[in-house]
Amino acid sequence: MLKHKTFINRISHSIKHYLSFHVSIANLKKISFFISLFSCLTSGSIMLFSLFSSSLHELYGINYLHINFIASLSAIGMYLCLPVLGYLADCYGPSLLSLISIWFFVPSYFVNSQVIKSLEYNNVMKIHLYAFGICFFFIGLATSSLYFSSLLTCAKIYPEHKGLAISLPVTCYGLSTLLGSQLMKLSYFKQYNGFLNLHKVFNFFGVLYLVMGILNFVSSSVVSMESEIIFTNEDEMEEADEESPLMTSRSRHSHHSCEDDDNLIPERSIIEPLKHQERFINFLKDKSAWLLLASLILNIGPMESFQNNLGSIIINSNSESNLSDQVSIMAASSTVTRLAMGGLSDYLSSSKRKFPICRVNLLIINLAIGIVGQFMVTRSTRFSIVSILNGSSYGGLFTIYPTIVASIWGIDMMGSTWGSFMIAPAIGSIGFSIFYGNEVDNKCGVDYSSCLQHYFNLTAVGLSVSLILIIIVWKGIWAKRGYRVF
């Protein structure tokens, strides 16, 4: 890995040397920030899987159990690898993740396009399913690499505005689904029967991510090399209390002492976090982190499954809604919520307010919306309302959770900490997606009227348990440590 770091630093130094003659530090920050946002805006192709799955089922006869097997492998690649990716980003810089995204995005999409070209209806062999599964695993890995590289770049450029610095890339990532679903409506990507021409779609994404990967590498490598200048200017040092993680700033003003708390106190760092391995181990020993992980599994799993199986859900809930329209509605509501929650979390929790409100309250509201959204899937006559509720909850969760993690354990550790939490969507998505596929294949061939009611009753219960766990962590652990508002 040292060779990788030397290679990346060499290229980064060349980029920095060239740009230093043309761009000021202030503009360098802005350029890197906007390139990272644009990368997020194009990185959500994996979130269009519900559009891909409809074509795979209708055009090639792949059943929903196999489709959910492929979706589960993409979730494993997307989320289960994030702890390692986050740790690498903290130690070697986010530019390494940009290279990883190029290595896996481009060949995977091109291989998928060739596999699709060789398929015929009801003539799909196991080798084809394995090829799809492996490629979507790597596409998931590449998605996380590109997105996480952009997210960390944004968060580390403007650490004094955690909510917005995190919510803007998260919002752009959500918006990428909306833009992608509209892009897939173009006649170029359609076949004569109205379904997607996956050969053209996969080739398009292969070329797109080659370009975006290179741009993102330039952006993130510049940030890696300029970190010392960017993060140590006088204005930021004056606001160190606001920028520092809770367990640093609060410890200066609190008189309570606890051995467990002391082990968790993060330290401010410039490029590579001080005592990173030791602090990461202490984070893994924190019981509140494990309870927070369990809550994330129980709420994000149903949301991921809902998004991956949206086409099947519309059909089996007797709705006449258009799939592309519902994907757009869900993406739009998710995008608006991500942006709103980022700004609200910064404003409501600000220490400058007379009565600051903890970010956890926003998380509780998001979970309540998600519970209603899951419960209404088989009971509402207007599916657009269901898409809005579930999209809003999904977007809010992916904004508030990382903001809370950055506030509690520190932005300089965010790659490792938030990356570790990303095993939750992998576990949750796999479990709930396989469960959904089994329910549909076994029950919905007989009775379409209520075949999904049992499944969505259980997902609503899962989100309710998640809400209870959040309250326990906040009131039962963090509040006792003195962290009531953050």
Swiss-Prot record:
Compartments where located: Vacuole membrane
Listed Pfam families: MFS_1
Signal peptide bounds: none
Isomerase in keyword set: no
Parts of the chain that traverse the membrane: 31-51, 69-89, 91-111, 132-152, 164-184, 204-224, 280-300, 327-348, 357-377, 395-415, 417-437, 458-478
Keywords assigned: Glycoprotein, Membrane, Transmembrane, Transmembrane helix, Transport, Vacuole
A GO cellular-component term linked to this record: fungal-type vacuole membrane
GO MF, one example: transmembrane transporter activity
Chain positions covered by the region annotation Disordered: 236-260
InterPro entries given in the database record: MFS, MFS_trans_sf
Main location: membrane
UniProt superkingdom: Eukaryota
Glycan attachment positions: 322, 390, 457
Entry keyword tRNA processing: no
Membrane topology: Multi-pass membrane protein
Similarity section: Belongs to the major facilitator superfamily.
Function noted in UniProt: Probable transporter.
Protein name as annotated: Probable transporter MCH1
